[in-house]
A protein has these predicted regions:
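Non-catalytic accessory segments of DNA primases and related replication-initiation nucleases
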Residues: 1-112, 116-121, 125-130, 142, ...
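Short, acidic loop-beta-alpha module within alpha/beta folds
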Residues: 3-4, 15-19, 71-78, 150-156, ...
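Acidic, divalent-metal-binding catalytic cores of TOPRIM
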Residues: 132, 136, 217
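Short loop/turn motifs at secondary-structure junctions and domain boundaries
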Residues: 135-140, 197
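A short, hydrophobic, proline-anchored segment that marks a local hinge/packing element in signaling
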Residues: 142-148
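Short acidic-glycine loop/turn motifs at beta-strand connectors
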Residues: 148-151, 165
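A short, polar/charged loop-to-alpha-helix boundary motif
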Residues: 162-178
């Protein structure tokens, strides 16, 4: 059935699967002891999360196109031994140099969702010529790794410098969608291989996961610059 399918193939718990299916058909699962106000807030939160997902997916597609348009970034990935096919499988992209590149992707660069999603940084204490707070892209001149939840939705990014620079890896900040200490990079693609193999390899970085997958080790995941937490372990059970 549909619930069993989501539990097996999306790694959801029974309750998560029920809520997900209900949301897809416009129903709301009653919460024990939840007031109407709490239910309304929960509905608004789900809507906000869906909107943020849309913003991040749009950015992911733009970064993928920018990778194809950047010989330097393509050469870097080839130098790391990665094929075009594996880059496509993982949705790798490139964030070009420039402080406001995403303004070409999102015409309304002042949209608050760009900050809430972690794509753009805003400095309230610095004002531009228009009197508004200064904004600029968080990720610049980096290989981009979309981070997806167990449903395959983009919830954030990891960006790696091409040359020397610090930090080598830059993650999305904490957002309504993304919590670094809870997520595992690559789990969305690795979940079936983990189940079939009966084991999982936990590595340090995004690039390790992609490289291992290219060489047939498809049951690898990476923590996002943190040690393995109880939340990570729970996702793998």
């Amino acid at each position: 059935n549909a619930i069993g399918f989501l539990m097996e193939h999306a790694g959801m718990s029974f309750i998560e699967a029920v809520k997900d299916l209900a949301q897809q058909i416009g129903l709301q699962v009653p919460e024990d002891d939840a007031s109407p106000q709490d239910r309304e807030r929960a509905a608004q939160q789900r809507q906000k999360q869906a909107t943020l997902n849309d913003v991040l997916e749009k950015a992911a597609k733009a970064y993928q196109k920018d990778l194809k348009d950047s010989p330097r970034a393509v050469t870097y990935l080839k130098g790391r031994g990665l094929s075009g096919q594996i880059a496509k499988t993982f949705g790798l992209g490139y964030a070009p140099e420039g402080w406001r590149h995403l303004a070409g992707v999102f015409p309304d660069y002042s949209e608050p969702l760009l900050v809430e999603s972690g794509l753009v940084i805003e400095h309230e204490d610095e004002k531009g010529q228009d009197g508004e707070a200064k904004r600029y892209d968080r990720f610049r001149d980096r290989i981009m790794f979309p981070i997806r939840n167990v449903k395959g939705e983009c919830i954030g990014f990891g960006g790696r410098v091409l040359d020397k620079g610090e930090p080598k890896y830059l993650n999305s900040p904490e957002t309504p969608l993304f919590s670094k200490g809870r997520e595992l990079y690559g789990l969305w693609l690795a979940r079936n291989a983990i189940r079939d193999a009966g084991r999982v390899v936990v590595v340090e970085g995004y690039m390790d996961v992609v490289a291992l997958a290219q060489h047939g080790v498809e049951y690898a995941v990476a923590t996002l610059g943190t040690s393995t937490t109880n939340a990570h372990a729970q996702k793998l059970l």
